[in-house]
Amino acid sequence: MDPEVVVKQFRSTDAHQMWMAAWSILQCNDADKVKTLKPYLPEFRKICHEINMGGAFRSNNESAELSFICVENAFRGICRCKIYSQQNILDPRRETDQGFITILWSELLKEKYEEHFRVQCKRCDDILNVREIAGGHVPWFVWRAA
């Protein structure tokens, strides 16, 4: 993530650019870079309040707000894994690929159309249980402390 690019993308007021900026924050595994965006949060929130970022199954504005929470948490020294229980869009497989967590085990429950995971945060070592629910068009994830 390039903080200067993120600032430009939010300031563009283009919904797609703003969505890309939010996700570059959410996918960044460098807390020091994420922290540098803290002074821009009031401006970003004002822009997002005025722009409908769209979204098919959920508002992309919610993703932007989640990215702002990541920035605030990084600034306060709070581990990124603390956002998991506040959302239902982050896939544990992708979080593993990006280096945030390790999947300790997973189990597919075909009769429930669910996959269950136990994961460990790579930063603070907290253990979390994740339930993927795939009964609709888009899977969603329920994250809980183990």
Feature roles, as predicted:
Residues 49-51, 71-82:
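Alpha-helical linker/edge segments of TPR/alpha-solenoid repeat scaffolds
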